Amino acid sequence: MKNSLIMTICMAAALTMTACSSNDAQRAAEDMLVKAEKYFNEGSYDRAKIAIDSLRKVYPGAVETRKKALRLFQNISLKEAQEDLALTDSILQRVTLDYKYIKDKVEKDKAALRATPDELELLTRTKMKLDSLKVRFDMQCAKIKYIHKKQKE
């Protein structure tokens, strides 16, 4: 009887200590998440991702906080992809105009038999740059679509 009472008291004490440390860990994880959100709102996406990564490594048991951190990570990735898409789009428009201008000039020079190797090389390089930008644009669109799909799950 005495042993079972001592055992019960020890278990209750251990359970209480675990609950307290769990609450402290949960609070610390929440603080880390708030810090990551602050970085995100300031536009420091890399710092926000690092904070989220640290949260996941240091507090693996803070499941609810980690779920919130995952949503924040998705928002960060989405924002980065949208900004990169906007930049890629503006560069793509400029390079498209450059390519059309160079192509028209080279075609006129070819017709007049005045096309130089430098002009032809410039046309080829501009076309390669244009194709590369189109691929990048398509990849960013696909990434944004994928992130939206994951956010709905």
Where does each model-flagged region fall?
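A conserved position within tetratricopeptide repeats
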Residues: 56, 96-103, 110-113, 117
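Alpha-helical linker/edge segments of TPR/alpha-solenoid repeat scaffolds
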Residues: 74-98
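Start-of-domain marker
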Residues: 21-68, 80
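Boundary/linker segments of alpha-helical solenoid repeat arrays
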Residues: 60-68, 84, 97-104
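Bacterial N-terminal signal peptides that target proteins for export
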Residues: 1-7
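TPR/TPR-like alpha-solenoid helical repeat scaffolds
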Residues: 62-82, 111, 119-129
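C-terminal motif of bacterial Sec signal peptides marking the signal peptidase cleavage site
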Residues: 16-19
